[in-house]
Amino acid sequence: MKYDNLLDRFIKYVKVNTRSDPDSETTPSTESQEAFALTILKPEMEAIGLQDVHYNPVNGYLIGTLPANNPTLTRKIGFIAHMDTADFNAENVNPQIIDNYQGGDITLGSSNYKLDPKAFPNLNNYIGQTLITTDGTTLLGADDKSGIAEIMTAIEFLTSQPQIEHCDIKVAFGPDEEIGVGADKFEVADFEVDFAYTMDGGPLGELQYETFSAAALEVTFLGRNVHPGTAKDQMINALQLAIDFHEKLPAKERPEYTDGYQGFYHLTGLTGTVEEARASYIIRDFEEASFEARKVKVENIAQSMNAQLGTKRVLVELNDQYYNMKKVIEKDMTAIELAKEVMEELAIKPVIEPIRGGTDGSKISFMGIPTPNIFAGGENMHGRFEFVSLQTMERAVDVIIGLVCKA
């Protein structure tokens, strides 16, 4: 179905810079996310008919309720999307609208960048559709402002059509998903539902209930700096220690070599001097045993290097971030079966594959609310080549409406 306000709503949202900050110690991590919640989303939620709309300054969540208008529909369903965008320029987002895409290259604004079907064959899935792209200087922010726009549009449709019967609906827009801490302070007591969905997936049909298990790894290397002219048998180069550590990890177990259910080690940052260096990694895997084995491996590498050095110069700090939500959701597949049924009735083929990433639903599922993930439309997310199809967004709205009417 077409929805009059969906595109304008999405464009309005993405023009607001809500980039999160991994180095911040506040919640939300950036003031712009709170401002976006309070000045744009909250008034709009109230205007379209959501009740008890409130912002929690402790966890950064904006929550609203649409009560059931049919007492026989007893389920309570939640929909969640995140307000922040990834670690890429989000200032002065200037979306391009490509009507009736006919294939071929899409030049991104006046930049030297283009969307090329040879580099991005997923473009070929969108012939004849309306695409929203960047101008080549920023990301788009469809991850996850497409999800926010879809939830808002579904609620607006339901409140404008009171004859359409639906169950109790809860809506939550949260912060800092992209830096892995968005759901850390989520309050289940403030979101009383039987199950929920994050609208944070990619192409049409995605329905996901398996995520990575994730850990953050920080490794500090302590060197000993002396003049290079007299360094023989004295200097210990911390940067070289970092290189040695990295080379001891399996070379083919990196993101660029893995897919499907394969896990990886990913070096995300490396800084330092001869005296001290620091390497940042993320560790990902699906199965609990292999996830734990990866963490043991880095500990063993550090221990081996320290033994060879004769002192503790490789310091490892490991922190689990989230876990594969399959462990929770497979105990009660109601949310998955309902979503599959609704999609099939809408002639959408459910694409059930693992998420090679995580969502807020991972943590929320372990808090007691099964929260699988549904497509929101974004492609090539987290960079200048991001785009989204308006038609896919419309279908996501259809799914939301179908879920609450069938509950």
UniProtKB/Swiss-Prot annotation:
GO terms for molecular function: metallopeptidase activity; tripeptide aminopeptidase activity; zinc ion binding. It is found in: Cytoplasm. Its cofactor is Zn(2+). It holds the Pfam family Peptidase_M20. Transmembrane segments: none annotated. It catalyses: Release of the N-terminal residue from a tripeptide. Binds 2 Zn(2+) ions per subunit. InterPro entries: ArgE/DapE_CS, Bact_exopeptidase_dim_dom, Peptidase_M20, Peptidase_M20_dimer, Peptidase_M20B. Keywords: Aminopeptidase, Cytoplasm, Hydrolase, Metal-binding, Metalloprotease, Protease, Zinc. It comes from the Bacteria. GO terms for biological process: peptide catabolic process; proteolysis. Its EC number is 3.4.11.4. GO terms for cellular component: cytosol. The active site is at D84, E177 (proton acceptor). Zn(2+) 2 binds at D143, E178, H382. Zn(2+) 1 binds at H82, D143, D200. PANTHER family: PEPTIDASE T. NCBIfam families: peptidase-T (TIGR01882), PRK05469.1 (NF003976), PRK13381.1 (NF009920). Cleaves the N-terminal amino acid of tripeptides. Belongs to the peptidase M20B family. This is Peptidase T.
